[in-house]
């Protein structure tokens, strides 16, 4: 990473993490529920999703202030999905980001409800915590985009399709369809949300939608690669869990080298799409490289 990207990520990450805690601390709820929600929100992580929202605003030369609550909303949804993914009825993981998973600390029932709370409260950040400069129409568009990305047409539907694909061989087309919904759509929302807040032209938004699909699939391919050759200490969870759970992955379908080539193809296409837009490209190019080369 260049000094520019390192500085950008470090400065904004602190802001995002602080605001996630502030938003949640202010909510009126049972103490046990608040502790469970904060436990997972404060467990670390890349904060890549909110940082993408801010990076797109930055690329258009616009203020990042309204990107913070919108980015935090996405991070809350991402965190809820991790809590639920780790449950015994799903992936049955005991470790997340180097710490015991939420249900191991607070019990399954509280973990489920903490996830429910994070999902529900996330939308309030968009409707009530952005500035008055963001019109009601724009807020509604953001909410609708987020519902499509996180709900049955996106992440939730993708998770079900992923579960149904276990213990059987799927085609590459099926695998990409699963991860387009399970992973790429929520990452894609971050790109689109930044563009909407920046008042980007509709033509740009459609190009960015395709761009986000490529980085989303690329992100998943890198995840699959790390599950084979990553460091458990850096990843913060068990390595090899995809194989243990008999999941189809890009390396299992294409070989490890084939998956790395596929990742390279997606990242190059994402950069090509950005190259045709009238915005500051350097930061987005570097984010593409970060997605392709990350070690956790």
Swiss-Prot record:
Residues at which isopentenyl diphosphate binds: 46, 49, 78, 97
Biological process according to GO: isoprenoid biosynthetic process
Family: Belongs to the FPP/GGPP synthase family.
Recorded catalytic activity of this chain's protein: isopentenyl diphosphate + (2E)-geranyl diphosphate = (2E,6E)-farnesyl diphosphate + diphosphate
Residues that bind (2E)-geranyl diphosphate: 96, 182-183, 220, 237
EC number: 2.5.1.10
Binding site for Mg(2+) 1: 85, 91
A Pfam family per the record: polyprenyl_synt
Keywords: Cytoplasm, Isoprene biosynthesis, Magnesium, Metal-binding, Transferase
Annotated residues for binding of Mg(2+) 2: 85, 91
GO cellular component: cytoplasm
Cofactor entry: Mg(2+)
Co-factor binding comment: Binds 2 Mg(2+) ions per subunit.
Keyword Zinc (UniProt): no
Recorded name of the encoding gene: ispA
Biological classification of the source: Bacteria, Bacillati, Bacillota, Bacilli, Bacillales
Molecular-function annotations in GO: (2E,6E)-farnesyl diphosphate synthase activity; metal ion binding; prenyltransferase activity
Name of the protein in its database record: Farnesyl diphosphate synthase
UniProt-listed Gene3D superfamilies: Farnesyl Diphosphate Synthase
Cross-referenced InterPro entries: Isoprenoid_synthase_dom_sf (IPR008949), Polyprenyl_synt (IPR000092), Polyprenyl_synt_CS (IPR033749), Prenyl_diphosphate_synthase (IPR053378)
Enzyme class, broadest EC rank: transferase
Domain of life per record: Bacteria
């Amino acid at each position: 990473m260049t000094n520019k990207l390192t500085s950008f990520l470090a400065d904004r990450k602190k802001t995002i993490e602080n605001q996630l805690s502030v938003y949640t601390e202010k909510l009126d709820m049972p103490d046990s529920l608040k502790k469970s929600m904060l436990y997972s929100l404060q467990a670390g992580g890349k904060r890549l999703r909110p940082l993408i929202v801010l990076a797109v605003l930055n690329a258009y030369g616009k203020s990042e202030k309204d990107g913070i609550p919108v980015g935090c909303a996405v991070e809350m949804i991402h965190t809820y999905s991790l809590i639920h993914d780790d449950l015994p009825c799903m992936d049955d993981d005991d470790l997340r980001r180097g710490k015991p998973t939420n249900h191991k600390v607070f019990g399954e029932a509280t973990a489920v409800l903490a996830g429910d709370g994070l999902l529900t409260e996330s939308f309030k950040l968009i409707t009530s915590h952005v500035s008055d400069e963001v019109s009601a129409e724009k807020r509604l568009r953001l909410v609708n985009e987020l519902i499509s990305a996180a709900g049955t047409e996106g992440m939730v539907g993708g998770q079900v399709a992923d579960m149904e694909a276990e213990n059987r061989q799927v085609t590459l087309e099926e695998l990409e369809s699963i991860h387009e919904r399970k992973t790429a759509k929520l990452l894609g929302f971050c790109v689109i949300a930044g563009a909407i807040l920046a008042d980007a032209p509709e033509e740009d938004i459609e190009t960015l939608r395709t761009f986000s699909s490529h980085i989303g699939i690329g992100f998943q391919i890198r995840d699959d690669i790390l599950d084979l050759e990553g460091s458990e200490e850096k990843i913060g969870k068990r390595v090899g869990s995809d194989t243990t759970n008999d999941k189809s992955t890009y390396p299992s379908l294409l070989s490890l080298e084939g998956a790395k080539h596929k990742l390279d193809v997606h990242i190059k296409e994402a950069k090509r799409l950005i190259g045709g837009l009238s915005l500051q490209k350097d930061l987005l190019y570097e984010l593409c490289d970060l997605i392709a080369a990350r070690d956790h």
